[in-house]
């Protein structure tokens, strides 16, 4: 009788530090710092006609971040900021719901990074995020009665740190392979390796990776054929070399050789994003939904910088 495999148990080496990092995530002073308060009002001048914006982009970004971290509706987040300013006796205005909704459409979100200076191993993947629709329990019990809509969040993750280095939001009719070049364009550092699943087994993906002088660790699809004849004088294709090696040693052995299992870090990051911030967005427009998801990615990076678990198999 075949015995059922038991999951290994893991323990933390840095439990005290990681516990403090988890507590720090909920600190208001982390998300609403003195620097944010000082830069709350917009002082930049565009030189164009019309009244300049009252609030800085940092102020709008901070409110959107508080909404994501504390799982509040936008109006409730505005109420939170009003109460904080009242408690601190700060005579600062707070943007209205209409202002927040409008400014969120065009807000530029930059991912906070801790650059290491070394060439990166980027692992890529995507996940679906529900925009609107019925709850899973209702669907299971009674079936669908209306259409459900999804957005796709595409991520590039630093294999060494778990930090998000690139993020793109699309509608659900974009394939993973179409978005990979855009993800790599967001990475300023040198890239030594790019890992992804079979959805990235496309010519444009290999071209984008080769343009960065990186190694592609992408398993060819099970019915894959050689793209370029072995006797040609042209440069050997990494994809064809991977396919030949898989035929020699098997797919499982090839994955071990190239460290393909590290690709699961992208899935772990997706899981963290959904567990911390939820599996759906509340904004009505696509631009607002994209901003919500990118704000979550930026907040997740800041949480990563506070401290990550250092685990070992017990």
Predicted regions and their residues:
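Basic, amphipathic alpha-helical segments enriched in Lys/Arg and hydrophobic/aromatic residues
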Residues: 56-57, 61-69, 251-314
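Polybasic low-complexity intrinsically disordered regions
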Residues: 45-61, 65-75, 79, 83, ...
């Amino acid at each position: 009788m075949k015995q059922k495999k038991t999951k290994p148990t893991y323990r933390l080496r840095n439990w005290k530090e990681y516990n403090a990092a988890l507590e720090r995530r909920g600190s208001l002073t982390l998300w609403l710092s003195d620097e944010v308060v000082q830069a709350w009002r917009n002082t930049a001048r565009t030189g164009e006609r019309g009244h300049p914006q009252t609030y800085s982009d940092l102020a709008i970004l901070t409110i959107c971040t508080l909404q994501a971290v504390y799982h509040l509706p936008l109006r409730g987040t505005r109420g939170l900021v009003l109460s904080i300013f009242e408690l601190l006796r700060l005579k600062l205005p707070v943007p209205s719901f209409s202002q927040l909704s409008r400014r969120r459409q065009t807000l530029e979100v930059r991912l906070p990074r801790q650059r290491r200076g070394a060439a990166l191993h980027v692992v890529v993947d995507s996940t679906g995020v529900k925009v609107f629709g019925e709850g899973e329990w209702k669907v299971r019990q009674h079936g669908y009665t209306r259409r459900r809509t999804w957005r796709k969040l595409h991520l590039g993750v630093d294999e060494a740190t778990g930090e998000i280095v690139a993020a793109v939001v699309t509608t659900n009719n974009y394939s993973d392979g179409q978005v990979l070049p855009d993800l790599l364009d967001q990475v300023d550092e040198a890239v030594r390796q790019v890992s992804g699943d079979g959805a990235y087994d496309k010519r444009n993906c290999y071209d984008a990776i080769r343009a960065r002088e990186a190694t592609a660790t992408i398993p060819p699809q099970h019915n894959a054929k050689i793209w370029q004849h072995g006797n040609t004088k042209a440069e050997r294709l990494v994809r064809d070399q991977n396919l030949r090696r898989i035929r020699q040693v098997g797919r499982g052995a090839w994955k071990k050789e190239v460290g393909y299992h590290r690709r699961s870090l992208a899935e772990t990051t997706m899981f963290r994003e959904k567990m911390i911030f939820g599996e759906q967005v509340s904004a009505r427009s696509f631009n607002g939904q994209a901003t919500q998801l990118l704000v979550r990615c930026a907040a997740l990076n800041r949480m990563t910088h506070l401290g990550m678990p250092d685990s070992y198999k017990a």
